[in-house]
Amino acid sequence: MKTNEHDYYSQLANWSFNEINYTSKNYTNWVYENEIKKHTKKDSKILDLGTAAGEKVLKRFPECAEILGTDFSEEMIKVANKNLKESGRKNISFRVMNNLEMDTQDNYYDIVTARHTVTDPKQIYKTLKPGGYLILRGVDKLDCWSLKRMFNRGQAFYDKKPISLVDYEAALNAGFKDVELIPLHVIEYYKTKEDLYALLIKVPILDDLTELKQNEEWERIPIEKDLFEKYVAENTTKKGIKLIRRYYGIIARK
């Protein structure tokens, strides 16, 4: 895990978006949670990497023999365990683990899931049973591209190769078979500019989390009010303030 990413996400104790008012429309059939359900059996063991506060696991993952959710942020895991108690769900646990320094058993899990987080396919391959699946959903380079271009910065803004291709090639190099890469197109509409601003404060859309050189310190650049207002003015529709999202899905078999 890059130091900048660790510091950024460690500051967030709340990964819920319930307070942000928006609607979304998917333009691709592939749905991350549906793929997980499709491959889950009653005796399946699932490892969810980058689980954050566990909301997705608790609300959308199917019942099975065992689910472990991990995150490198202690604050996130504290909230996840609190959410677990309130949910009443069984056979689920949460603990701290760095995705790039996995300490899970070899050949143990039937499915490893990862949503919007850094992964190491070689370590995932080791912890999966033969025939097990990696199911991944990520944020691609062209996500919110018109917004990033207006601010001339943002997550993956200067990357030469899209992260979707990086992850796809990494899965192949790790030894996975039947690796499939699916582009995911979504348009979101935010009810007010305050809702959009709340999103930009919470997630690193406009932040460059590229690792810095030794002794350099990463500081978050404040959102320029004039550029933000310009984007809102140019993208306000009857449905709300438009934000074009670009994600990707990967499913691979060991």
What residue spans do the PLM features occupy?
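Short alpha-helix
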Residues: 160-175
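A short acidic, Gly/Pro-enriched loop at the edge of an enzyme's catalytic core
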Residues: 102-111
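A short SAM/SAH-binding and catalytic strip from SAM-dependent methyltransferases
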Residues: 110-122
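Conserved Class I S-adenosyl-L-methionine
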Residues: 180-254
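Class I SAM-dependent methyltransferase SAM/SAH-binding core
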Residues: 47, 52-101
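A short glycine-rich, Lys/Arg-flanked "PGG" loop and its adjoining helix->strand segment in the class I
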Residues: 121-133
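Conserved class I S-adenosyl-L-methionine
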Residues: 1-40
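Short, glycine-/aromatic-enriched active-site segment of Class I SAM-dependent methyltransferases
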Residues: 140-159
